[in-house]
């Protein structure tokens, strides 16, 4: 809430690993936006007001990927659970599909199992795997991918 997103209106930020589970902290973050209630409105570093409510930036400018489940074992089971929780907390429009391959997960079968398990979560998860949200972050993504292949 420094005003940076207002100063750079085209800037979009992508955080990895659901930003460490940001969905669990959204209520707290929203609460801290109430500067008058907290008595910080008169403090220079805290008193600057953004042009829009916090959720505007959350829904339009901040993106999160779903990598970072737990490591190489049980990628399908634990990875899909991580994505399921994440999609309950962060809008599909802001969630990008990702894996930890080849870092934490080095086995192609584990990755394939993870992808299948995520797709099985339902239409939102399938849309995420298919890149619907990524197209919001990266303009002309499909055209760029076609050119590079």
Place the predicted regions along the sequence by residue.
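Histidine/acidic residue-rich metal-binding segments in metalloenzymes
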Residues: 1-61, 77-93
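Mid-to-C-terminal alpha-helical segments outside catalytic/metal-binding sites
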Residues: 2-3, 11, 21, 63-64, ...
